[in-house]
């Protein structure tokens, strides 16, 4: 497990790059499970970015990554952005990996990002609770076991209004039976 300071340093560098380029982004994945559910170990940082703006700014993105101590493979990143597939960056100083998703898994999720204090005095855009739950449901449908527990914890700590929105989104995604199945599972013993 990496110290909090490593996450903060790496995120600070990455968010500065996205902000300088005008690329909308938000945190997602295991880190948001910690924010919305309960603490669990995570080894990387997951970030969803606006594909269109990133594609337009790709050469500038590469230059900024070079100056901020990130290890990356330009042809792989270019291909991933074209295909809207995940690519990775490695912070050479902190040895922390960033998984960058140049597409929204849930349509419109970047428009619903929430500013949350992720570190003391540092607010960052984070996937909304409802979209986080819906994304976990999509990952479960693709075989992610870890997302099952995350989804239950996010749902359990949601307001009734958010639970209704999660149910509605699951219905839209044609994953309502899977949501019911996951919510009906017993909690694992720690």
Predicted segments, located by residue:
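Compositionally biased terminal segments of proteins
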Residues: 1-190
């Amino acid at each position: 497990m990496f110290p909090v300071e490593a996450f903060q340093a790496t995120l600070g560098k990455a968010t500065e790059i996205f902000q300088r380029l005008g690329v909308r982004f938000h945190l997602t994945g295991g880190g948001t499970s910690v924010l919305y559910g309960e603490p669990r170990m995570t080894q990387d940082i997951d970030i969803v970015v606006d594909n269109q703006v990133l594609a337009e700014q790709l050469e500038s993105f590469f230059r900024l990554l070079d100056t901020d101590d990130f290890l990356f493979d330009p042809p792989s990143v270019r291909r991933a952005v074209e295909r809207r597939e995940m690519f990775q960056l490695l912070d050479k100083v902190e040895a922390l990996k960033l998984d960058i998703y140049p597409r929204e898994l849930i349509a419109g999720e970047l428009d619903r990002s929430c500013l949350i204090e992720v570190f003391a005095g540092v607010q960052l855009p984070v996937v909304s609770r409802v979209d986080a739950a819906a994304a976990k449901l999509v990952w479960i449908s693709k075989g992610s076991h870890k997302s099952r527990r995350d989804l239950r914890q996010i749902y359990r700590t949601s307001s009734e209004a958010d639970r209704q929105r999660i149910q509605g989104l699951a219905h839209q995604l044609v994953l309502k039976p899977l949501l019911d199945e996951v919510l009906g599972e017993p909690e694992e013993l720690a």
